């Protein structure tokens, strides 16, 4: 007998005249958990009780736009022959996490400067919450029939429904990449909390080290998972942007972790 992960039983439900997608339910739940975790952590670190709400509400639209843009650019062939409004149909899925990270990061530094808040302290408070929210989002991907991999004979393979997968042999089983990434995210959260409690507080590490570790570890994890991921559509550039994005996350993480060393080196050079 072959055990497998069944197709999602539903994709949404009716709430009066409104059809609510399960994807949006999990996205909303993830956003609420992210806010609560980040707010509590930032209050402990700084005593500031107002900034988290301001930051989350201010960054919501830039993050969604960046995530959607990343998805569309990564899958241009999917939208070439579709009505233009499909580009904006985020309720059907299609948000690129990596794009959301970078668009949010850029906008965050702007508002942190305006509000005169220590940016890297907030990013340290934010990092675990991002991963928890992403776990919720990946559950939403399951209900949307997204983020699965290539065919597999492993006993935890994902069974796809017949709807929406005409180009695939739905009698086969596929790697549940969404589940792999949930496990990866939980693993990274544990590492971040251990580093924060047992390493970063006992040694001289700059603020932002937790966030830097998140970027590096997640980037490495995406590199490991990406070869198993099934891409229904490719972009028109012949380039897998997820590899580029994962590499960029690693590089930015290393730069954040090493910024004090880089800055001190510049100061020494300027004095020569």
Curated annotation (Swiss-Prot):
UniProt subcellular location: Cell membrane
TM annotation in the entry: 15-35, 53-73, 94-114, 117-137, 174-194, 199-219, 237-257
Entries under Pfam families matching the protein: LGT (PF01790)
Key words of the record: Cell membrane, Membrane, Transferase, Transmembrane, Transmembrane helix
Annotated S-S bridges: none
Protein name: Phosphatidylglycerol--prolipoprotein diacylglyceryl transferase
Species assigned in the record: Tropheryma whipplei (strain TW08/27) (Whipple's bacillus)
UniProt xrefs under HAMAP family: Lgt
């Amino acid at each position: 007998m072959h055990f497998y992960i069944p197709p999602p039983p539903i994709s949404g439900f009716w709430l009066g005249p409104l059809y609510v997608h399960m994807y949006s339910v999990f996205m909303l739940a993830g956003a609420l958990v992210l806010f609560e975790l980040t707010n509590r952590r930032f209050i402990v670190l700084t005593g500031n009780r107002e900034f988290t709400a301001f930051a989350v509400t201010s960054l919501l639209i830039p993050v969604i736009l960046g995530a959607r843009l990343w998805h569309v650019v990564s899958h241009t062939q999917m939208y070439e022959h579709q009505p233009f409004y499909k580009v904006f149909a985020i309720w059907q899925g299609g948000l690129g996490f990596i794009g959301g990270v970078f668009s949010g990061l850029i906008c965050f530094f702007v508002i942190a400067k305006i509000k005169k808040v220590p940016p890297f302290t907030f990013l340290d408070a934010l990092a675990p919450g991002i991963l928890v929210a992403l776990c919720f989002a990946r559950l939403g991907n399951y209900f949307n029939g997204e983020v699965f991999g290539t065919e597999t004979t492993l006993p935890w393979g994902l069974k796809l429904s017949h709807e929406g997968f005409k180009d695939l042999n739905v009698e086969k089983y596929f790697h549940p990449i969404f589940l792999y990434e949930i496990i990866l995210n939980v693993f990274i959260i544990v590492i971040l909390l251990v580093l924060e409690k047992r390493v970063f507080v006992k040694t001289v590490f700059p603020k932002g080290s937790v966030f830097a570790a998140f970027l590096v570890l997640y980037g490495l994890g995406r590199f490991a998972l990406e070869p198993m991921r099934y891409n229904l559509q490719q972009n028109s550039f012949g380039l897998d942007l997820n590899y580029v994005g994962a590499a960029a996350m690693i590089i930015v993480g290393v730069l954040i972790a090493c910024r004090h060393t880089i800055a001190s080196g510049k100061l020494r050079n300027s004095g020569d």
